[in-house]
């Protein structure tokens, strides 16, 4: 850059700082780049698929899927992991369907969890914005976008037409809170439902509620689906779950993770540790026996998982090794099976 341009730029920067304050414009090279802080989802495979070890703080995340696919379970698991790190969490229950007992079974400290059950969509989003601006809340869950009913619709008659009200409400709210979320370094997760577009003959007829604003503002979008049942004998004790990262602004997108959700217990984390540990050679599998550092830990996956449950220090050591290997390596160097191979189907539990 020639001297005249340098002087002009310096004068412009000085004027901007004088008018808008120091730091309004800065060179990216003046400050050391820092890794994006993340909060674990409770699923080891999903944390790895997200590329940074979890969901990014200071960003908006959308989780959507069909009914009973595990959306709320995944968000409650995220809250439980955040609380373990000392985070303050809030749950804006627009659906009025939060079960404290189920949340407690997933590891959530319900005594410290902030809960709101707003009457209207405007109230829910205003509460969310105030919690964000407090700079004191680390994780906020909004369950769900479909339940954010505008006040005009609630006060109107059944059958009244309210075209685009919810879409305008979401667009206005997201414009307002996005900057505050970044400044507060707060993770805001919107749970969303799926609807079918009428008259679609070709392509995917599925869409999410709340129009397009959330799709643009979200840094991460997760599509969660139930792919099968987990059985013990003839009894169904859980569900096979697949999560696809359909949008990711902080790492490469379109990776996916498969894990199991056990009813009343949540994400089967030890099963994931065993699967990934075997793939990476951290655990040895010989026939039905699993071994760790030369010592047998169980015959069959269920017994190996029980060993990890009884010896959390071993589980933590294996998980740390998995994270160190997979999160430090570029995506091209990771085993392809981690993205595409389904969870071990033979009685995982």
UniProtKB/Swiss-Prot annotation:
For this UniProt record, the keywords arranged alphabetically read as follows:
ATP-binding, Cytoplasm, DNA damage, DNA recombination, DNA repair, DNA-binding, Nucleotide-binding, SOS response
Top-rank lineage group of the source organism: Bacteria
Query: Does the entry feature the keyword Cytoplasm, yes or no?
Result: yes
Chain positions recorded as ATP binding sites: 65-72
A GO MF term = ATP-dependent DNA damage sensor activity
The UniProt entry's GO CC annotations, sorted and at most eight, read: cytosol
Report the record's Gene Ontology biological process terms.
DNA recombination; DNA repair; SOS response
* Principal location: cytoplasm
User: Do you know which SUPFAM superfamilies this protein is assigned to?
Assistant: P-loop containing nucleoside triphosphate hydrolases, RecA protein, C-terminal domain
Location within or outside the cell: Cytoplasm
User: Which PROSITE patterns does this entry report, sorted A to Z?
Assistant: RECA_1, RECA_2, RECA_3
Please give the InterPro entries that the UniProt record associates with this protein: AAA+_ATPase, DNA_recomb/repair_RecA, DNA_recomb/repair_RecA_CS, P-loop_NTPase, RecA-like_C, RecA-like_N, RecA_ATP-bd, RecA_C_sf
**A Pfam family hit:** RecA_C
Q: Which family does it belong to?
A: Belongs to the RecA family.
What job does this protein perform? Can catalyze the hydrolysis of ATP in the presence of single-stranded DNA, the ATP-dependent uptake of single-stranded DNA by duplex DNA, and the ATP-dependent hybridization of homologous single-stranded DNAs. It interacts with LexA causing its activation and leading to its autocatalytic cleavage.
The name under which this protein is listed is: Protein RecA
Recorded source organism is Azotobacter vinelandii
């Amino acid at each position: 850059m020639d001297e005249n341009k340098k002087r002009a730029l310096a004068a412009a920067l000085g004027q901007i700082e004088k008018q808008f304050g120091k730091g309004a414009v800065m060179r990216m090279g003046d400050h050391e780049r820092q890794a994006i802080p993340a909060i674990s989802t409770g699923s080891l495979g999903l944390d790895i698929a997200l590329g940074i070890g979890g969901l990014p703080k200071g960003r908006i995340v959308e989780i959507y899927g069909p009914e009973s696919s595990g959306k709320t379970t995944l968000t409650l698991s995220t809250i439980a992991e955040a609380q373990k790190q000392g985070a303050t969490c809030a749950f804006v229950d627009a659906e009025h369907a939060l079960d404290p007992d189920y949340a407690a079974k997933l590891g959530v400290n319900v005594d410290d969890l902030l809960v709101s059950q707003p009457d209207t969509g405007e109230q829910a989003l205003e509460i969310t914005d105030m919690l964000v601006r407090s700079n004191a809340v680390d994780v906020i869950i909004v369950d769900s976008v479909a339940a954010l009913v505008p006040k005009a619709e609630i006060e109107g008659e059944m059958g009244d037409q309210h075209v685009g009200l919810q879409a305008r409400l979401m667009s206005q709210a997201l414009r307002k809170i996005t900057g505050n979320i970044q400044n507060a370094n707060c993770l805001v997760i919107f749970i969303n439902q799926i609807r079918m577009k009428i008259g679609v003959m070709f392509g995917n007829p599925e869409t999410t509620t709340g129009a397009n604003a959330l799709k643009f503002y979200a840094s991460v979008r997760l599509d969660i689906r139930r792919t099968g049942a987990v059985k013990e004998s003839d009894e169904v004790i859980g569900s096979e779950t697949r999560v696809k990262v359909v949008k990711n602004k902080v790492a490469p997108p379109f990776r996916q993770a498969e894990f199991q959700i056990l009813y009343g217990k949540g994400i089967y984390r030890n099963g994931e540790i065993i699967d990934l540990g075997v793939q990476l050679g951290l655990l040895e599998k010989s026939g039905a026996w699993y071994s760790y550092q030369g010592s047998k830990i169980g015959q069959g996956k269920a017994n190996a998982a029980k060993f990890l449950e009884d010896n959390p220090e071993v589980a933590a050591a294996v998980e740390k090794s998995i994270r160190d290997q997979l999160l430090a390596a570029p995506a091209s160097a990771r085993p392809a099976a981690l993205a595409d191979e389904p969870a071990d189907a033979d009685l995982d539990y």
